[in-house]
C-alpha cells in the first residue's frame, strides 16, 4: 500500500500548435454538432507558461511525490521526460480505446479513476493554475482529508459558462445528500471563520432546503482517489455518457462532481478562502503581473480571456513576468 503521506500532482496539457492534433480535431469537429460556447478555441490556446509551472512546483512544493503530466501524446521540447518525479501519461495509457481520440477535458479528468499508480491523495491542476508561493502538504491535506472551502453558491446561467455541466453535478449531489443532514453533521465546516465574507452566502441560503450549488474558486483541487471510485461506482452511466463525448457537451459531468461529493460528505478540512485567486487574462494584465511579483496568494489561476485583441503582446508581457519570478531552469527541463 502506498504511503498515505504521499501526495501526487496531476496536470493536463494540450499543444494546440501540434499539426497532427489540430488535423484530427478539425476532422472530428465536422462529424459532431459541438457546442461552441463550451469548445471555443480559447479553451485550447497554449500560452507557453508550462515550463514556469514546473519551476514553481520545484521551488515552492519540492515535497511532491510524483507529477502526472497528462497529454494526448505530445510533450514540450524542453521537458525531460526521464525525470524521476515525472510520469508522462498519454491518453491511450489510461482511457479506453473506444473513447479516443478525445478533445474533451472532462473525459481526460474523469478517467483518472483508471490511473492505477496514482496516489490516494492527489491535487488536480489545470495548465493555467500555478503555485505562487511556498506551500506545505498541510495546505492540501490534513488528517488524510482534502483541504477545501465549504461555501454554498447558487448556479447562475451565463453565456459561455459551464453552468449546464455544473447543474448535472448538482442533480446527482441532491440525489444522494440532504442539506439538512449535511449541516447537522458538519455545521462547523460550512460556517467557518476561514471563509470571511463568503460566510454570508451560506447564511443567505439557509432558507432553501435543497443544495443550490457550491462556490468554485477555479484553483487546483485536492482529491482522494477513493472518492472518485465511490462516485464512479454509483453513477457509472453518467460517467460513461461523458466518456463518449469527443467534445464538451451540456449533458455531461466534470470533476467538480467529486469535489461536491467530498464537501457534502464532510470529508474535507476548511481552508482559508484567501489561499488562492482566479485571474482572467485581459488586454491589460497588470493585476496578474503584480500578483506574480508580490505573491499575495499561494495559488493562482490565470484564466484565458476570450476577448484579447493583442494576444502576442500580452503573452510577451506575461512571459517576462514569469521569467523574472522564475529565472532559473528547473530540473524538469533538459540541460
UniProtKB/Swiss-Prot annotation:
Name-wise, this protein is Capsular polysaccharide phosphotransferase WcwK
Supply one GO BP term: polysaccharide biosynthetic process
Cite the InterPro entries for this sequence. Answer: Stealth, Stealth_CR2, Stealth_CR4
User: Could you share any additional remarks the record makes about this protein?
Assistant: Stealth proteins are part of a protein family that is conserved from bacteria to higher eukaryotes. Family members were first identified in microbes as proteins that help pathogens to elude the host innate immune system. Microbial stealth proteins are involved in the biosynthesis of exopolysaccharides. Stealth proteins are predicted to function as hexose-1-phosphoryltransferases.
Key word Ribosomal protein present = no
Enzyme Commission designation = 2.7.-.-
Native organism is: Streptococcus pneumoniae
Task: List the keywords (alphabetical).
Answer: Exopolysaccharide synthesis, Transferase
Amino acid at each position: 500500500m502506498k504511503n498515505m503521506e504521499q501526495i501526487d500532482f496531476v496536470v493536463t496539457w494540450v499543444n494546440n500548435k501540434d499539426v497532427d492534433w489540430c488535423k484530427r480535431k478539425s476532422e472530428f469537429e465536422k462529424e459532431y454538432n459541438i457546442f461552441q460556447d463550451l469548445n471555443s478555441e480559447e479553451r485550447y490556446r497554449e500560452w507557453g507558461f508550462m515550463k514556469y509551472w514546473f519551476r514553481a512546483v520545484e521551488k515552492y512544493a519540492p515535497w511532491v511525490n510524483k507529477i502526472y503530466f497528462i497529454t494526448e501524446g505530445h510533450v514540450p521540447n524542453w521537458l525531460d521526460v526521464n525525470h524521476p518525479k515525472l510520469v508522462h501519461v498519454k491518453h491511450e495509457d489510461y482511457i479506453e480505446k473506444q473513447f479516443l481520440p478525445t478533445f474533451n477535458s472532462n473525459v481526460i479528468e474523469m478517467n483518472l479513476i483508471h490511473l492505477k499508480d496514482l496516489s490516494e491523495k492527489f491535487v488536480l491542476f489545470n495548465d493555467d493554475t500555478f503555485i505562487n508561493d511556498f506551500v506545505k502538504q498541510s495546505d492540501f491535506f490534513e488528517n488524510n482529508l482534502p483541504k477545501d472551502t465549504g461555501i454554498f453558491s447558487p448556479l447562475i446561467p451565463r453565456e459561455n459558462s459551464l453552468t449546464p455541466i455544473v447543474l448535472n453535478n448538482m442533480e446527482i449531489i441532491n440525489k444522494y445528500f440532504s442539506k439538512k443532514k449535511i449541516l447537522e453533521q458538519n455545521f462547523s465546516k460550512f460556517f467557518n471563520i476561514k471563509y470571511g465574507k463568503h460566510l454570508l452566502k451560506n447564511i443567505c441560503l439557509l432558507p432553501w432546503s435543497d443544495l443550490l450549488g457550491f462556490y468554485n474558486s477555479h484553483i487546483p483541487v485536492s482529491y482522494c482517489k477513493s472518492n472518485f471510485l465511490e462516485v464512479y461506482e454509483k453513477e457509472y452511466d453518467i460517467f460513461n455518457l461523458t466518456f463518449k463525448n469527443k467534445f464538451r457537451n451540456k449533458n455531461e459531468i466534470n470533476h467538480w462532481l467529486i469535489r461536491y461529493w467530498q464537501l457534502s460528505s464532510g470529508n474535507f478540512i476548511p481552508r482559508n478562502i484567501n489561499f488562492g485567486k482566479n485571474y482572467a487574462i485581459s488586454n491589460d494584465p497588470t493585476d496578474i503581473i503584480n500578483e506574480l511579483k508580490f505573491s499575495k496568494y499561494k495559488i493562482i489561476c490565470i484564466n484565458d480571456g476570450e476577448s484579447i485583441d493583442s494576444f502576442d503582446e500580452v503573452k510577451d508581457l506575461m512571459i517576462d513576468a514569469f521569467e523574472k519570478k522564475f529565472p532559473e531552469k528547473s530540473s524538469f527541463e533538459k540541460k
